[in-house]
Amino acid sequence: MKKNIFAAATLCTLFFVGCNNNPETVVEEFYKANKANDFEKALSYTNIAKEEREEVIDILSDMGMVIHEYKVLGSTIDEGDTTATVDLHLVTSSAFYPDSLADDIKVPCVKSGRQWQVKLI
């Protein structure tokens, strides 16, 4: 009985992980982690190589950017199903610009294997 429950739980997990693999979800999770200052997790949603992430984390920490809010507005997946653009409304501030700045931006994404990633390089 325990084996059946474990197998069912594993299948459900794999199913839901696969369902969330779209450009909008990846961008949402990327900005959610950034807002929480969890840069290591945020970079796990990008195409930055693992060995380069520590340097990028230092840069992000030094920037002092604060994400107040973000909202995915939509996305476009290109014909080849390998690149996408996610439209995002973003409100930020930083030590350099303490007043909130709101902007609609386009976040590029790339597909690596079956996984979508935020394209930073």
Predicted features and spans:
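C-terminal motif of bacterial Sec signal peptides marking the signal peptidase cleavage site
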Residues: 15-18
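Short, conserved catalytic or interaction motifs in soluble domains
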Residues: 21
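Exposed beta-sheet edge and beta->alpha loop/turn motif
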Residues: 77-121
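Sec-dependent N-terminal signal peptides
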Residues: 6-11
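Positively charged n-region of N-terminal signal peptides that target proteins for export
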Residues: 1-5
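Short solvent-exposed beta->alpha transition segments
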Residues: 24-25, 34-87, 97
